[in-house]
């Protein structure tokens, strides 16, 4: 596996020197300063590459080239946004970058309710509390029809939760959900958020799939011609929220994507933490079934709670993900590719570390503090080395 590290650009509290000291050789980054829908120019791409090269690092994966909301809703200037996306892909390929992660989640990117969930050892994790989210939907956002998504017991719990909230609690929960987490290119006020949700009135799961299919038919041929690997990221959490459809949450969704545009350039970012939230997702089977289409991996573990729709981020080798089995499957695919003549390792990054040690005293990007990810990368590296020394000696020699 290629050991990579997500970096949010010059304003990231974690420096490129820190990244190099962590032992990563590749960087996963994006041009966050370019507005959604605009073309990434060769000049801007080369500028970022030069920043990385000066520190002895390479730009391994783009995460992400954001998909404009008008593409998802097929409104406004969506065809122009697609044309701009195509040109950005060509420009990235011209600059030697061959793997692009993206997602097709409506309105919100990844979603959490608590960014400072205290763990027993004193470190902090990210958490999605289903009842807190229900309190937001039912009593703060007051979304029409939201009660249909919750049982009577959950509605009662949400009402109790809301009654106990202070004004600061309400502001914090609202901000955590709609203000934009790291990697999200857009944040909203409450009124803007209601307006965004309204844009999806009449767009159900089938319709959003149609829109994704149209997008894929437009961009996959460009990726094929340019030698780019596209890697769609799963929904996080992997189910419908806020009445919005989600189209990349299960093995059936993965199968649909492959069948819709059957090309090796139309592939997946296999995020174990996102897919792993669902108890019905067999991660190893999903990975092995679509191994030849997995172009990028996010390795992290989540811990489902008493309410199975609630979860928090676990340590990388703990929680509900069998990380040893996952890495074993990744290495098996790497060996298969190597025997077929493709010696490129599959890029992997340690996803979402705990905030711990000295980072507890610092301002950090939620989920992306340095020390927690350093710990995760070291643990994942150890599993990889152990498997290479015992089961995949051909890769060790390679």
UniProtKB/Swiss-Prot annotation:
Protein name: Mannonate dehydratase
Cofactors: Fe(2+); Mn(2+)
Involved pathway(s): Carbohydrate metabolism; pentose and glucuronate interconversion
Role of this protein: Catalyzes the dehydration of D-mannonate.
Species name: Pectobacterium atrosepticum (strain SCRI 1043 / ATCC BAA-672)
HAMAP family (alphabetical): UxuA
Keywords from the named record: Iron, Lyase, Manganese
One annotated GO biological process: D-glucuronate catabolic process
Protein family: Belongs to the mannonate dehydratase family.
Stored InterPro entries: Man_deHydtase, Xyl_isomerase-like_sf
Catalytic activity entry: D-mannonate = 2-dehydro-3-deoxy-D-gluconate + H2O
